[in-house]
From Swiss-Prot:
<dbReference type="GO" id="GO:0003743">
    <property type="term" value="F:translation initiation factor activity"/>
</dbReference>
<dbReference type="Pfam" id="PF01176">
    <property type="entry name" value="eIF-1a"/>
</dbReference>
<keyword id="KW-0963">Cytoplasm</keyword>
<feature type="domain" description="S1-like">
    <location>
        <begin position="1"/>
        <end position="72"/>
    </location>
</feature>
<comment type="function">
    <text>One of the essential components for the initiation of protein synthesis. Stabilizes the binding of IF-2 and IF-3 on the 30S subunit to which N-formylmethionyl-tRNA(fMet) subsequently binds. Helps modulate mRNA selection, yielding the 30S pre-initiation complex (PIC). Upon addition of the 50S ribosomal subunit IF-1, IF-2 and IF-3 are released leaving the mature 70S translation initiation complex.</text>
</comment>
<dbReference type="GO" id="GO:0005829">
    <property type="term" value="C:cytosol"/>
</dbReference>
<keyword id="KW-0694">RNA-binding</keyword>
<protein>
    <recommendedName>
        <fullName>Translation initiation factor IF-1 1</fullName>
    </recommendedName>
</protein>
<dbReference type="InterPro" id="IPR006196">
    <property type="entry name" value="RNA-binding_domain_S1_IF1"/>
</dbReference>
<comment type="subunit">
    <text>Component of the 30S ribosomal translation pre-initiation complex which assembles on the 30S ribosome in the order IF-2 and IF-3, IF-1 and N-formylmethionyl-tRNA(fMet); mRNA recruitment can occur at any time during PIC assembly.</text>
</comment>
<keyword id="KW-0648">Protein biosynthesis</keyword>
<dbReference type="GO" id="GO:0043022">
    <property type="term" value="F:ribosome binding"/>
</dbReference>
<comment type="similarity">
    <text>Belongs to the IF-1 family.</text>
</comment>
<keyword id="KW-0396">Initiation factor</keyword>
<dbReference type="InterPro" id="IPR012340">
    <property type="entry name" value="NA-bd_OB-fold"/>
</dbReference>
<keyword id="KW-0699">rRNA-binding</keyword>
<dbReference type="GO" id="GO:0019843">
    <property type="term" value="F:rRNA binding"/>
</dbReference>
Length: 72
């Protein structure tokens, strides 16, 4: 899938779930299941509840999102 097909949104982590997944509330109010991107895993970037994150979603499954950036 081309990068242009991805939807980027801002959100806030609500809770940690098993297997490095998170419940993320998007700025439009929807709650999705987020998982960490590979580069964030590789560099051991920790995500805690309350963190502001940027997520990337595919138009085919709007209930899951990849966390690609954690704001400071």
């Amino acid at each position: 899938m081309a990068k242009e097909d991805r939807i980027e949104m801002q959100g806030e982590v609500l809770e940690n779930l098993p297997n490095a997944t998170f419940r993320v509330k998007l700025e439009n109010g929807h709650v999705v299941l987020g998982y960490i991107s590979g580069k964030m895993r590789m560099h051991y970037i920790r995500i805690l509840p309350g963190d502001k994150v940027t997520v990337e979603m595919t138009p085919y499954d709007l209930s899951r999102a990849r966390i690609i950036f954690r704001a400071k």
